[in-house]
Amino acid sequence: MATLEDKLLGEKLEYYCSSSEGEDNGDEGGDNKGASGKSRCSGLTIDTNPDATPAGGFRQQSSTNTGPKGVVKDWQRFKQLEAERRDETERQRLALAKKLTITATTSAEDEERKRQEELDAELDELMSEDFLQQYQKQRMAEMLRQTGHHQQFGQVQQLTSHEEFLACVEQENKHTTIIIHIYERQLAACATLNKCLDSLASDYPSIKFAKICSSVAGMSRDFRTKGLPALLVYKAQAVIGNFVRLTDDLSDDFFASDVESFLIEHGIIVDRALYN
């Protein structure tokens, strides 16, 4: 009958390592054990190679932590990537907006420059001499219409009495310029001036020209010899011009154009070229 030890040994015989058996095969086993990397113990083969694949065909490998901490870490990484994408999108949006702004600004500057060039061209045209003269004529004609210069005279009126002299001045429109020549028949300069005034009366029909003999006007003998020819200019019953002995300015030999220039220079009449 087998003993308890035999039973135990018999049941574990497959896993039992005999020391004597290892000693008998020591010389042979030394070479085999080094070559195969395996050791045998009473029929039990133990593979000591750490890289060997288990019999079931599976091999244990390390894996990412999928616990709560791993989930939090993954979520944080996701939010980080999402924030980076937002930053990149914002940078691209700002770059595009800047580009569009530059383009829009350039277009606006071009339009402003073009508008300024057009204004400069118009200003140059307005400042041209021809335009200014035309504008001055139109403005002068408008002013003459507004001040009652629509009245037409066209010739020199002969005043034969002191009363006519007063009526000529006091009964005229306040906007009308009245030029009265005080003359003496025997003076050649007075005769020349009368002819010049006849011509100017035709050229300036809105101005009232008149003449009166110095004796009729009540002038003294001394004035008749030293002050003639003389011009008195009235407007709104007030004297605005008093010119005596015109030969001092015009000389003894003068023409209608000389008288015209003299009156224009002193502001008595306005050059007809401005409103004709």
UniProtKB/Swiss-Prot annotation:
<keyword id="KW-0597">Phosphoprotein</keyword>
<keyword id="KW-0143">Chaperone</keyword>
<dbReference type="GO" id="GO:0008277">
    <property type="term" value="P:regulation of G protein-coupled receptor signaling pathway"/>
</dbReference>
<dbReference type="InterPro" id="IPR036249">
    <property type="entry name" value="Thioredoxin-like_sf"/>
</dbReference>
<dbReference type="InterPro" id="IPR051499">
    <property type="entry name" value="Phosducin-like_reg"/>
</dbReference>
<protein>
    <recommendedName>
        <fullName>Phosducin-like protein 1</fullName>
    </recommendedName>
</protein>
<feature type="region of interest" description="Thioredoxin fold">
    <location>
        <begin position="153"/>
        <end position="276"/>
    </location>
</feature>
<feature type="modified residue" description="Phosphoserine">
    <location>
        <position position="20"/>
    </location>
</feature>
<dbReference type="InterPro" id="IPR001200">
    <property type="entry name" value="Phosducin"/>
</dbReference>
<feature type="modified residue" description="Phosphoserine">
    <location>
        <position position="18"/>
    </location>
</feature>
<comment type="subunit">
    <text>Forms a complex with the beta and gamma subunits of the GTP-binding proteins. Interacts with the CCT chaperonin complex.</text>
</comment>
<feature type="region of interest" description="Disordered">
    <location>
        <begin position="18"/>
        <end position="74"/>
    </location>
</feature>
<dbReference type="GO" id="GO:0044183">
    <property type="term" value="F:protein folding chaperone"/>
</dbReference>
<dbReference type="InterPro" id="IPR023196">
    <property type="entry name" value="Phosducin_N_dom_sf"/>
</dbReference>
<comment type="similarity">
    <text>Belongs to the phosducin family.</text>
</comment>
<comment type="function">
    <text>Functions as a co-chaperone for CCT in the assembly of heterotrimeric G protein complexes, facilitates the assembly of both Gbeta-Ggamma and RGS-Gbeta5 heterodimers.</text>
</comment>
<dbReference type="GO" id="GO:0005829">
    <property type="term" value="C:cytosol"/>
</dbReference>
<feature type="modified residue" description="Phosphoserine">
    <location>
        <position position="42"/>
    </location>
</feature>
<dbReference type="Pfam" id="PF02114">
    <property type="entry name" value="Phosducin"/>
</dbReference>
<feature type="domain" description="Phosducin">
    <location>
        <begin position="62"/>
        <end position="272"/>
    </location>
</feature>
<feature type="modified residue" description="Phosphoserine">
    <location>
        <position position="19"/>
    </location>
</feature>
<dbReference type="InterPro" id="IPR024253">
    <property type="entry name" value="Phosducin_thioredoxin-like_dom"/>
</dbReference>
<dbReference type="GO" id="GO:0061077">
    <property type="term" value="P:chaperone-mediated protein folding"/>
</dbReference>
